[in-house]
Amino acid sequence: MSDSLTELLLEIGKALIVLVGIVGAGAFMSFIERRLLALWQDRHGPNRVGPFGLFQLLADMIKMFFKEDWIPPFADRRIFILAPIIAFTAFILAFAVVPITPTWGVADLNVGLLYILAIAGLAVYAVLFAGWSSNNKYSLLGSLRASAQTLSYEVFLGLSLMGIVIQTGSFNLRDIVEAQAGLWNVVPQFLGFITFLFAGVAVTHRHPFDQPEAEQELADGYHIEYAGMKWGLFFVGEYIGIVLISSLIVTLFFGGWHGPWLPPFFWFALKTACFMVFFILLRASLPRPRFDQVMSFGWKVCLPLTLINMLITAAVVLMNVQ
């Protein structure tokens, strides 16, 4: 077997392992969320299927798989089917450039940050397609909310990272992690971290920024007409987005795989898991603001913070050069 073929097979195997790990982490997070919410709300949570309810996730998957794959007769069939596929794959493709360890990652791109912002932006199309193709007023209103919120906060998401790019001089995520060997970016880039955290919650439509779904207002928003595995793709895609944002926070601000004693993979996984639990804690503890308050917070608070962070970082770098 030639070296090139061996290398190709290794890369394919590596990509498959990362794919299974991401989907598994996103699916398992849904179970952990239900257990933690039950703990914090003083109730039992899922505890009937398997020991400690561990097989509840498998039961839910079987249920979704065997539910009727119904498409409304008034829907645009092709776009209706395409929407959940885009929602599921966009965040997975974005994960391709995230370095898990010094030697483990699917791709090492010099423009890794730009790639993530571009690919993650495809999720907006999934929301718009779902809302428009469903031909339902609540679905359309939810998709319009989601697209406005996502497009707005993706601006802040990108601007919050420009301070890191100015500081490290690279869009490569591996270079950014290596630059944090002595000091994590969360210290000099604290404003960038805060705005990235807010924007990450908003882009993934998580509580308290879950305005596109707002059950009390929009009857579950843009995926109201979806059922079975199509709804399951939206559901798992949301949790994969949380895994992606958590891993990016760790990679960009908390040193990635760097840490004492433990192997690099365990440090990366432990830090990522901590932020995934933090996302769940936000859902359990915060109320949902109005949609106009969410948009005002982005443009009146997050945008100025990102610009201030860029100016401070540029000034510090310029002073160090001189």
UniProtKB/Swiss-Prot annotation:
The keyword Transmembrane helix applies. Keywords: Cell inner membrane, Cell membrane, Membrane, NAD, Quinone, Translocase, Transmembrane, Transmembrane helix, Ubiquinone. Its EC number is 7.1.1.-. One of its GO terms (molecular function) is oxidoreductase activity, acting on NAD(P)H, quinone or similar compound as acceptor. It catalyses: a quinone + NADH + 5 H(+)(in) = a quinol + NAD(+) + 4 H(+)(out). It is found in: Cell inner membrane. It comes from the Bacteria. The chain crosses the membrane at residues 12-32, 79-99, 111-131, 151-171, 183-203, 234-254, 262-282, 301-321. It is a multi-pass membrane protein. It holds the Pfam family NADHdh. GO terms for cellular component: plasma membrane; respiratory chain complex I. InterPro entries: NADH_UbQ_OxRdtase_su1/FPO, NADH_UbQ_OxRdtase_su1_CS. GO terms for biological process: aerobic respiration. NDH-1 is composed of 13 different subunits. Subunits NuoA, H, J, K, L, M, N constitute the membrane sector of the complex. HAMAP family: NDH1_NuoH. Belongs to the complex I subunit 1 family. NDH-1 shuttles electrons from NADH, via FMN and iron-sulfur (Fe-S) centers, to quinones in the respiratory chain. The immediate electron acceptor for the enzyme in this species is believed to be ubiquinone. Couples the redox reaction to proton translocation (for every two electrons transferred, four hydrogen ions are translocated across the cytoplasmic membrane), and thus conserves the redox energy in a proton gradient. This subunit may bind ubiquinone. This is NADH-quinone oxidoreductase subunit H.
